[in-house]
Amino acid sequence: MQEQYRPAAIEPAAQKKWDDARIFNVSEDASKPKYYCLSMFPYPSGKLHMGHVRNYTIGDVLSRFKLLNGFNVMQPMGWDAFGMPAENAAMKNNVAPAAWTYDNIEYMKTQLKSLGFAIDWARETATCKPEYYRWEQWLFTKLFEKGIVYRKNGTVNWDPVDQTVLANEQVIDGRGWRSGALIEKREIPMYYFKITDYAEELLNDLDKLEHWPEQVKTMQRNWIGKSRGMTVRFAVSDDSKQGLEGDYAKFLQVYTTRPDTLMGATYVAVAAEHPLAAAAAADKPELQAFIAECKAGSVAEADMATMEKKGVPTGRYVVNPLNGDKLEVWIANYVLWGYGDGAVMAVPAHDERDFEFATKYNLPKKQVIAVGDNAFDENQWQEWYGDKENGVLVNSGDLDGLDFQTAFDAVAAKLQSQGAGEPKTQYRLRDWGISRQRYWGCPIPIVHCEQCGDVPVPADQLPVVLPENVVPDGMGSPLAKMPEFYETACPCCGGAAKRETDTMDTFMESSWYFFRYMSPKFSDGMVDPAAAKYWGAVDQYIGGIEHAILHLLYARFFTKLMRDEGLVNVDEPFERLLTQGMVVCETYYRENDKGGKDWINPADVELTFDDKGRPISAVLKADGLPVVISGTEKMSKSKNNGVDPQELINAYGADTARLFMMFAAPPEQSLEWSDSGVEGAHRFLRRLWRTVYEYLKQGEAVKAFAGSQDGLSKELKDLRHKLHATTAKVSDDYGRRQQFNTAIAAVMELLNQYDKTDTGGEQGRAVAQEVLETAVRLLWPIVPHICETLWSELNGAKLWEAGWPTVDEAALVKSEIEVMVQVNGKLRGKITVAADASKADLEAAALATEGAVKFMEGKPAKKIIVVPGRLVNIVV
């Protein structure tokens, strides 16, 4: 065995050994329990970042732990390869997105392999490959035929200069990110998935997910947003019907969760796109201008909370069905046309947003809820105004004195008797629009025919292949400019027709990739039925909390769609979910001449610390001049505070990177980058190597201790007790708790005790062998390369075949224990007694200690309290 720890030599050798043995290449095996471990697959952006390293190391630790415990472990890897960044990079570098993507995949795959992950690379999948998205298109056509996928108009951001649709994140302060042009809102036909048909099941099945973080489930519940309320129809006043047709000329419909406050409504507000708004604006330029302003604004619901609330009165009126009050209709920018009815009733006295709006525009506030003796002040909002639980109705005629639920039922009865409303359960969740007016995505398999309408592409003509030799120019959809792509024959009538040139939302690919991994080369369907039956759901899923809503919700939705198509036999895709924290690092900057910030990489900064080790100043190494310490933030390109994993691996080895990532913080918490922490991790691995080296230097490896320990010295018994207590703890830390930092700390403590123990002689050497073999197996999931190498030196066999160490229960039973002695609650000494010592023996031994004699000062004991196995407290 070489004396020095050299990761550059041992890591490739260990990886070759695993690859040659194909230990991570798995197939269905009914003789073993299965374990499907999956970390969210990466977008091939070019290089791995530290967040990737942390994410995939967590999955690898769990996979290797289960492998040693006899499970048939599948840990696949692939690439979430479609998306806008590839198009942006293509325009910047004048290269096709496909070429850019495939180059990145090759480089990142090399990086992943260098980290030694236990990945079954035979299952590798890239979502931009036709053999993958063919089946996505196939499912789309099936669901289109069933009506679960449908087409309707949707609002998009239109850049009039670049002549293209922009994503919300490409709109900056209302202008296109490339052209700088003011963005327009346009209605265009788009395809939608009826996720609302599954809203109730998606909500209820969250209760099945016992091993998901409660925070994630709460976020999904709020996103689905089930509410019980009432539809209310306000009759349109006779003098306000001009320009309106059909039901819009009869009534204005709203949905409210607070029908108990209906008597307090003082106006109603509609979206800019509402027919009543259009009718009112027909001859009013000021209304037309406001409507145009609203349509140019953001369509994102998230922006509604922070944006300034604006409105304009229409001069049109509707009638409150309960009290006959005539309420003016306002056009308001906070009402969204795509949500509900595009209209809301406003009760300023009991809704904070309405209160602020009414205050701004001097609209009336009518109190209809009272809570105790609290006085209503229309000049200042108070929290109790919106109290549903404790309020009772006032100023509401025969409804006065009713609580919320009683009032809800009474209002429902009144409205239903008039045909003016009824109770309704509603969801915040909206159908999922999947059309994207971009190039680098999965083509939507629809043909538009003037005779036959929208026709799904037949299965035998799939996939509709995306041309890969295209370099986008940012000026509209490339596919819409390619007759060779869009010109086709109608599958129904054979006449001239046109392919759909929109592509699918990239969340589509990530909504089912975990099923494709089960049989990635299966050519007769989305997933091989036998493989789907064996692997079932993912046992452990790992990814960031930022995916709590969209990706995880869509993946759950797709699982139910595929189940209903008979493709899989599970209701939920992920049994257990771990949401790892971010990797964060200090940030530094200098202000530039333009008032902006030039961010400086931490590696280029030199710090000065106070006597407590806290940074107090920083200078740039290159010029010695000060830089601003800006605090700790997530590693990112924009803040220039990232650390290249490849540099870390080159300097210290993959095992050091893995160990630091697992030891620096519990997996669900943020991990703060620390150069000293990395160096500390490397020191520990050198120590581990040195410990085994010194042991083998004293003689050849022996058979690890096993059997009765009656003949062992107390010191060796204590070491074995520590060893097996550590094994039990680490097993629990890996399996149930998933807290890897405490597992590492436990092994460090074990090695500390090993260093202090005399392991000379035949028995001592056998116990030493047992300790070192076990420590190496306990650490293999985290630092597999060094452990694989040390195991071969200690044992000569293959570590992955050795199995997880078992706990010797006999070793956990101590013949002697240490008990604290207190006098009047203060520690005055310790005694070593037999583990089964009686209460009387413990009392006698405690009273005889030097500390007890000294501090009792000759006084008799009033009481002696014995806590078995822990302490004796003498009260005088």
Curated annotation (Swiss-Prot):
One of its GO terms (biological process) is leucyl-tRNA aminoacylation. It is an enzyme of class 6 (ligase). Its EC number is 6.1.1.4. Transmembrane segments: none annotated. It is found in: Cytoplasm. A motif ('KMSKS' region) lies at residues 634-638. Keywords: Aminoacyl-tRNA synthetase, ATP-binding, Cytoplasm, Ligase, Nucleotide-binding, Protein biosynthesis. Its main location: cytoplasm. It comes from the Bacteria. It holds the Pfam family Anticodon_1. ATP binds at K637. One of its GO terms (molecular function) is aminoacyl-tRNA deacylase activity. The keyword Transferase does not apply. GO terms for cellular component: cytosol. A motif ('HIGH' region) lies at residues 42-52. It catalyses: tRNA(Leu) + L-leucine + ATP = L-leucyl-tRNA(Leu) + AMP + diphosphate. NCBIfam families: leuS_bact. HAMAP family: Leu_tRNA_synth_B. Present in outer membrane vesicle formulations which are used as vaccines in human. Belongs to the class-I aminoacyl-tRNA synthetase family. This is Leucine--tRNA ligase. It comes from Neisseria meningitidis serogroup B (strain ATCC BAA-335 / MC58). The gene is leuS.
